Amino acid sequence: MDDLEKKEHLPMTDRAEENKQAEGHLQKKLKELDKESNTAEYSGLWAKLIAVICICFSLFQIYTGFFGALDAMIQRCIHLSFGISLVYLLCPTKRSWVKDGNVHPVDLALAVIATIPPIYILLNYHQLILRAGTVTPADAFMGVLGIVMVIEAARRIVGLPIVIVVLAFLAYGFFGRYMPGPLAHRGLTINQMVGHLFFTTEGVFGIPMGVSSTFIFLFILFGAYLEKTGLGKFFIDIANALAGWASGGPAKVAVISSALQGTISGSSVANVVGSGSFTIPMMKKLGYHKNFAGAVEAAASTGGQLMPPIMGAAAFLMAEFVNIPYMEVVKAAIVPAVLYFIGVFLGVHFEAKKDNLQGTPRSELPPWGKIMKEEGHLAIPLVAIIGLLASGYTPMKAALAGIIVSIATAMLRANTRMTFNDVVDGLIKGARGALGVLIACASAGMIIGIVTKTGVGLKLASTLVDLASGNFLLLLFCTMLTSLILGMGVPTTANYVITSTIAAPALLQLGVPILAAHMFVFYFGIIADITPPVALAAYAGSAISGGDPLKTGVNASKLGIAAFIIPYVFVLSPQILGIDASLTSIVITTCTALIGMTGVSAGMIGYMADKTNLLERLLLLAGGLLLIDPRLATDAVGIGILAFVLFLQLMRKKKNAKNI
């Protein structure tokens, strides 16, 4: 009898206690794997003080969302002041310093000091405008202090890799005159760097911070309220009703529920822990190996950052960088995201057929009608925000409306109704949930500042083109590797900023449409979460399943193989993103990509209509990959190869059935 079966036979009180312990274990694992979740918990006066700061932070963002953002520099300074002070309070210098629920004096002092530089800008705003370009000694001191405090905040809540990358760019800015060849520049003085990075909207307070202080925060707050309503449970219940009974049902439930959860969340690790605590034990119970069970949830949850309407934070940056409305990014992302989840679903289906894994008996599944009656109203805010974005409302207004609608719709039934404390708790959770992205955006702004001040972006782009000798596919491969390597330690936001300023221009030089180039680096930055050896989402999945993290990551990469193919598809065939495309071209490109993914997925798993031998696996992979190329000849050959393998398997299966 395994652990899950033992648990089912426990008395109710013991089972409740075990569930509580399991929840505590999962939260501990989440904090180990996701620095944004690894915050200290205080009690008494300090807990109340931090809650008040969080509430004021959220109310400020709601106010400016309703009545319009303040001047760019003022809005971003206030945003940073709130955020950075909370980081120093919630992410202590040493965990051992958090005693008796009190903030250590050192962390309190740092929290106060960190707010001084942005407040200095607020108090001297007009004087700074009048003496633009001139940096006084006081300015220099405050600028250096502000940069140092942002970097230390990044170390605390984002991680050491982003700090290393930022310091490398700062060093390049200062020591540029000593760099070899085309990378050399005349070098920047301390005053030049400080003036550009801290007292303009080109560095810390640049585009990433602007997006964080307007769109991203409100969408995170919207997600916090959707979570409070219980929408995540509704998604799992709906997925169970749709696919729980099918072959490999629990795994398909994980894919569908994670796809739905991805519409409101942008964190791979948090998604794994949230839905995986339910789906992974169910998969193990019905026969999935623990490594594969963790991999299914990791691959599905990582895809959540690709699923509109609320994608990863980098998607909002993409809209600004490409200079298009956010809704255009959403529209472009729909078909690739659906293809990704179909690819994961196919992998799960083939694995279930290969190992003859059954679904959950229908008698154990929640009735569809009952789910919709009791919880269906929870989807109204999601429908509302999609409708508002499609109608041309700004992301700020749409997110604000979504927050109001989510609270209002929760009141429609007693089982989902929010109390005043729930509403306040949503404000607190929203503010805390935005801190990691906020600091990542501030750090990414410094990277952009150095790139724009030194011109290194175009130099590196030209170098990439030269290294690839103008070979288009080789350049795409190099760009993919860059995004994956950065994504192993740098959060998606900073990863996207770096690759979009360095690698994306190289793709543009070879004629790739700007949206396709940016979407290409965006995708691979996210897929790093399931790419070994780091693969944070896979580590989270293995922590729940009890599997091996590396093997879980390998399985997750196999399941998520679609994500490695789709970016090549939309660079070679931009029609799939809706770029200069007719409905016919979109349908044809989507269908060929889907057939190709089916072949590759079957080849990776080792099953199509029957278990494959080595030759059939190689043919399936080759046929699927040929369909990436949009030319008619390669499509015809690819489809022919896949049809041939399918025919062989059907004949063999028929022959084996007769012999039984």
Task: Enumerate the language-model features and the residues they cover.
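Membrane-water interface regions at transmembrane-helix termini and the short interhelical loops
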Residues: 40, 64-68, 91-101, 127-128, ...
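Membrane-interfacial loop-to-helix junctions in multi-pass transporters
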Residues: 137-141, 202-215, 241-255, 286-292, ...
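Core transmembrane alpha-helical segments of multi-pass membrane transporters/permeases
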Residues: 152, 157, 167-182, 190-194, ...
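Hydrophobic mid-bilayer segments of alpha-helices in multi-pass membrane transport proteins
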Residues: 50-55, 75-88, 106-115, 140-149, ...
